[in-house]
Every structure is written in C-alpha cells, then in structure tokens.
C-alpha cells in the first residue's frame, strides 16, 4: 500500500512538472503572438492638406495588400496602401482588417496651417538706422505648431511692370510672430534710357508646413564703452544644435524704433555663443536705446 501511494505521488510530481514545462514553453509564445500585430500609429493629428501613411506590422514584417477604410471620407480619405489625406476639419477612424481582427487609427484633422498665418510689410522709419534694409516683414503664426512659411515679394515699377521677385522661408514658432528685415534697393529699369521707378511691392504666401522650432534663448548685457564705441554682448544658448538668422530691433525711451540690424548665429547644444553689437559713441543720443527685441527665423 505504501509503495502504491509513493507511486501515485511520483506520477503526480511528473505530471505537475510536465504541465509547468508546457506553460513555460507555450504561454510566452501565445502572449507574443497576441502582441506582435500592430498599427504604426493608433492616433494621428493632421492639418488640412497633409498626408500620413499607416502601416500594419505582423512582428517585424509589414503586411501588404490590405483593405483600408475611412469612417468619414469627407474629413480624411485613405487609399489602398494606407496613405491618409486630410481633407476637412473633423474626426475619422481608419480601419483595417487582418486575421479576422480590426485595427483602428483615430484621426483628428485641424484647420489648414495657412488659415492661421498672417503677414504684412512694414516700412522702417526714415530716421531709424537700418543699413541696407528699408522694409520689415511681420509674420504671425497662430497655429499650435511651429511652421515653415514660404513667402514671395514681387517688385513692380510705377506703371505696374514686373521687376524682380524675392522668395524666402521663415521659421515661426507656435503662437508667436517674427520680424524679418528686407532689402529692396531702388534701381534702374532701362540701362540705355535710365528711368527711376517707384517701388510697388506685392506679398504672397506660397506654403506653410510643420517644422522644428527654433529653441534659441538670449541674454543681453548692459552697455559698456570701449575705444569710443558703445557695445552690448548678446549671449545665445540652446539645448540642441540650432542655427538661425535674427533681426535686432532697438527702441528709444519714447518707444520709437531707432536702429535695426540683422545677423546669423550657430549655437551648438548646451554651449554659450557671444555676439558683440555696437555703434559709435557719437550716436548715443540719436539711438537712445532703452529696449531691444530679437527675432529668430
């Protein structure tokens, strides 16, 4: 009887061990199998006119020849390869079926980026020092993302004939504005019969797209005199490598713009970069600089 009980205990032990081995060997595979099929994104925020391509992966392999569907084709449509096109402000669900299971990506479409960008040309006051610059362009970005704005300014003569065009890209951080300095020298139309033309400028917005922000900070030192000049040191810093053009606008005690200059700065990550800005001591009263604003673009 004792031998029989011992035999039963041995059999139970062997069975338990076998079950433990099966759990160790099989269960992780089942868990992995349940997790390895997934969409590249389950939530996407797009702006009208933008595209995004969804992918479905089975493990590390991309699944092809799928049938994608949109719950609201007026807001966002999707083609046979999973490319989403944002059409109108609203919400939509992009669905794909694979191995009898549905996978869903929630899409939020916001207004077109261009709808929230404004721009204008501003004359620089004649009594303000501006070097070769005679215009400022103010670009306002009311989007909740940083944008790259492509703007053209066409120049015409007094009779409306085209002279030249200047096209530039400007980066404007979210919910802010920049002021860039523009150079438009007056010139001659006909070299054989020189005729001065009056400037007529027409500005147009070509495109707006999302981009990385310009994360540059700056500190301006108190003015100091050196060899007949008044200087200020501008120290730039950034947590990541950044480079940008910048406009410096100086105002007097009455709030009038008295001096504008431009520059370029390259800032390595977590380093301090110093620029020295100065003018002759004879212009101290003329400029009467009490406030300085710097705009990066």
Give the ranges of each region predicted by the language model.
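Exposed beta-strand face motif in extracellular beta-rich ectodomains
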Residues: 90-94, 149, 244
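Extracytoplasmic soluble-region selector
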Residues: 29-112
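Terminal connector regions
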Residues: 185-229, 281-297
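Sec-dependent N-terminal signal peptides of Gram-positive bacterial secreted proteins and lipoproteins
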Residues: 7-29
């Amino acid at each position: 009887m004792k031998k029989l009980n011992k035999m039963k205990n041995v059999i139970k032990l062997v069975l338990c061990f076998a079950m433990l081995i099966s759990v160790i060997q099989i269960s992780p595979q089942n868990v992995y199998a349940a997790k390895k099929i997934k969409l590249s994104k389950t939530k996407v925020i797009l702006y009208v006119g933008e595209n995004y391509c969804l992918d479905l992966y089975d493990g590390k392999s991309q699944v092809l020849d799928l049938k994608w569907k949109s719950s609201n084709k007026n807001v966002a449509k999707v083609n046979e390869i999973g490319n989403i096109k944002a059409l109108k402000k609203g919400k939509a669900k992009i669905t794909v079926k694979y191995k009898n299971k549905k996978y869903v990506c929630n899409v939020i479409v916001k207004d077109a980026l261009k709808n929230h960008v404004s721009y204008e040309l501003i004359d620089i006051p004649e009594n303000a020092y501006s070097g070769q610059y005679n215009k400022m362009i103010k670009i306002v970005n009311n989007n909740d993302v940083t944008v790259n704005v492509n703007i053209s300014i066409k120049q015409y003569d007094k009779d409306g004939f085209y002279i030249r065009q200047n096209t530039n890209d400007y980066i404007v951080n979210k919910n802010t504005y920049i002021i860039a300095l523009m150079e438009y020298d007056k010139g001659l139309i006909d070299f054989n019969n020189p005729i001065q033309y009056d400037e007529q400028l027409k500005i147009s917005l070509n495109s707006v797209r999302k981009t990385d922000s310009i994360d540059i900070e700056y500190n301006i030192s108190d003015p100091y005199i050196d060899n007949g000049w008044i200087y200020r040191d501008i120290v730039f810093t950034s947590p990541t490598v950044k480079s940008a053009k910048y406009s410096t606008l100086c105002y007097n005690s009455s709030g009038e713009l008295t001096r504008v200059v431009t520059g370029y700065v390259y800032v390595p990550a977590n380093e301090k970069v110093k620029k020295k800005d100065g003018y002759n001591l004879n212009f101290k009263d003329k400029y009467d600089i009490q406030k300085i604003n710097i705009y990066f673009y």
